[in-house]
Amino acid sequence: MITVSDLEIQFGKRTLFRDVNLKFTPGNCYGVIGANGAGKSTFLRILSGDLEPTRGTVMFGPGERLSVLKQDHFAYDECTVLDTVLQGHSSLWKVMQEKNAIYMKEDFSDEDGIRAAELEEQFAGMDGWNAESDAANLLSGLGIKEDLHYSLMKDISGKQKVRVLLAQALFGKPDNLLLDEPTNDLDLETVMWLENYLANYENTVLVVSHDRHFLDSVCTHSVDIDFGKIQLFAGNYSFWYESSQLALRQAQAKNKKAEEKKKELQEFISRFSANVAKSKQTTSRKKMLEKLNVEEILPSTRKYPGIIFTPEREVGDRILDVRNLSKSIEGQTLFRDVEFTVEKGDKIAFLSRDPRAMTALLEILAGNEKPDTGSFTWGVTITNAYLPLDNSAYFQTDMTLVEWLGQYSADTSETFLRGFLGKMLFSGEDIYKRVKVLSGGEKMRCMIAKMMLTNANVLLLDS
């Protein structure tokens, strides 16, 4: 259980949230939601103890264990995969290390024997005999094959490290579990495994995710960070969204009614204030006006980009023909003899246990890679726009944002580009930022803006 009391966090003059009083209880999964920059990750860092709040306290149940999904992918480079997972239960890991060190001694003393017996008791009490098999099961569930369990972390891929660190967070079924974007770099099958695992989790979970389908699957409650405060709602993301939109509409309708009444009273008072015969009615309406409240509806931190794809040309009936496509990387076959046809109006999702296969196929269709065998033909009416998985190559430049977008626009005037960037939530001096310093989310908005400017009639989207 986690109890938050009178919590407030400020950065300079900016207050992210204040007066936060919440309780998170076992058996529930809480989805932490809010706009980029609202303070979702900051809130989790405060709960984990990595960041001191400006004011307030965070308390855990007596003797409860907290586990956090680590974000540093290089912290365990010299550890094996299995040992990295075991370190998720720090108390157990310390017992294991001390116990092993004692047994390695050549001059084993009586004191060592007494201490070893104490450690063995602690080890058994923490279910240490099943620790390695439990860790191995988590790794297998998250798609890390058994032959990698004794590899060093520095020798596995970045995407595999993400899964190992997730297994580390889950290991030992901690009383309180904090997960920041746990589905990043996971394939569909692994996401489904994680959904099932968390849906049956008996302890307290808080999760930050931009994946609303994942939040709908696992969350019993929603924790909304907006308007400078944090509110708790029963229900998953979809239930929160419907409830919050209804509450906003009701508040707006109430204010509209109050404004209309206010205007009516003011008009009566102005019209009859000098009329002695109407003095009682005028006084009565003045009192009514004083009591009339129009509640302030604070501006939301949520802002939505204007993403509109306007094709320059309508597509024909035949969009794409793919015949016998095959592709291998370093001797490993990603796909073989792929055939399909895309027709007008189709929306197709590619699924694979190996994300490299999907990326390779889209790279081929976008014209960036060549297949080993086979061919594909786009329809004569088709112009495609491609959103790659890795966009880093597009931003290795000293260009400003407005200069960068100008490369892809027929209209290169700053007025047009500024307006277009404004639709994608870049305003004021933001347009003069160097693109190489943009955040991942900002770069993604730039890539979508680039796609919009192509006026394409077919979209290729990689994750």
Mark where each language-model region is.
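Short low-complexity stretches enriched in small and charged residues
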Residues: T25-P26, A277-K280, T301-R302
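Intracellular alpha-helical coupling/juxtamembrane segments of multi-pass membrane proteins
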Residues: S243-E296
